[in-house]
Amino acid sequence: MSKLSKQPPKIIVTKMGFDGHDRGSRVVAAYLRDAGMEVVYTPPWQDIHGVVKLATEEDADVIGISSLATDHLLVPKLMQALREAGMGDMQVIVGGIVPPKDEKLLLDAGVAQVFHPGAALEGIAVAVRELAAKARSLRRDKILTK
């Protein structure tokens, strides 16, 4: 077993754009931390390039975006910026108020999963663990094929 696979999943929990309502993201971040994950929690109002930079610096497995208003519409641009930075294997989840038409847009852009209000915290934790394992596997494969 590699050293990387023994480390707990690492997730960045953030809010992009002008949405400052952070109660939900704080609850999720605390639950994930209590579940043994390494959580990097940012203040609200992050921009796309700041999130990409932080994901690179932190060597995160998953990025969790919280959205109460329409700031989830920035996520397709985040996905593009991640691909341009060579981080196309980054697993991204979105949680919050996301209308069905926007959910399709996010999934089509490469978001791994969308969680709606009332989603079970345990289910979010399971998804983050699975997505972290997937991200690590994709990174290993990328290294081995170079």
Model feature map: region roles:
Residues S25-L131:
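Cofactor-cradling patches in redox/metallo enzymes
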Residues M1-T42, K53, E130-L138, K146:
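ATP-dependent carboxylate/acyl-activation modules
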